[in-house]
A protein has these predicted regions:
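Active-site mouth loops of central-metabolism enzymes
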Residues: 1-13, 70, 74
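Flexible, glycine/charged-enriched surface loops at secondary-structure junctions
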Residues: 32-33, 38, 57-67, 94, ...
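Glycine-rich phosphate-binding active-site loops on the catalytic face of alpha/beta enzymes
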Residues: 18-41
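C-terminal helical cap(s) of enzyme catalytic domains, especially alpha/beta-barrels
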Residues: 35-57, 187-190
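Long, charged amphipathic helices and adjacent flexible linkers at domain junctions
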Residues: 48-85
Length: 193
């Protein structure tokens, strides 16, 4: 979008570059000079947003749909994230809520591009900003890990207060059980809030 530093119109090649980044699965795109020293910072953001929305909503975008099948150390977590995304689509869940310590679960869910909100709760302040750059992810600080049941109830209530869920919405919750065992999501639960 570099020509938009001085021009209201992007070149065909620039539009193609932005579109290809979406088709390649990029979670985020970045502008630099276009908004910091450019003559049309608002217009360049509008143009890029329009390109991104158009390409993301295209039927030409194909998200891989094959379930994980290589039994690595993270096989259970990967499988649960995959099935959470599929289940959320099937039951039209409004959100997938998960806890994470490293961010791995958020990366996995985001990769499947579910239509549900991806709400990620972590006690690791270092990764909050990184998580919010992932496709579809909204990350929140949460540090009250008492029991799995209580935690699921609390994060669903937080999601309601933040406007991501309403009463009677379905939500897919991912946690580790016991909850003290951080690092390995092994539980998928469907709730109606």
């Amino acid at each position: 979008m570099e020509t938009m530093i001085d021009s209201l119109t992007a070149t065909r090649a620039e539009v193609n570059d932005v579109a290809n980044s979406v088709m390649d699965g990029a979670d985020a795109v970045m502008l630099s000079g276009e908004t910091s020293v450019g003559k049309y910072p608002v217009e360049v953001i509008r143009t890029m947003t329009n390109i991104l929305r158009t390409v993301e909503s295209s039927e030409l975008i194909v998200v891989p749909q094959e379930a994980p099948n290589i039994r690595t150390k993270r096989f259970i977590t990967k499988s649960i994230c995959y099935h959470a995304s599929q289940l959320a689509k099937g039951i039209q869940a409004k959100a997938i809520c998960t806890l994470t310590n490293s961010g791995y679960t958020a990366y996995q869910i985001s990769a499947w591009r579910p239509s549900s909100h991806i709400l990620v709760f972590t006690s690791n302040k270092r990764i909050l900003t990184q998580l919010n750059l992932l496709w579809g992810v909204k990350a929140f600080y949460y540090n009250n890990l008492n029991s799995t049941d209580k935690t699921v109830t609390e994060i669903n209530q937080i999601a309601m207060k933040m406007g991501y869920l309403e009463e009677e919405d379905m939500v897919v919750n991912l946690t580790s059980m016991p909850i003290e065992e951080k690092g390995m999501v092994n539980t998928l639960r469907v709730s109606i809030v």
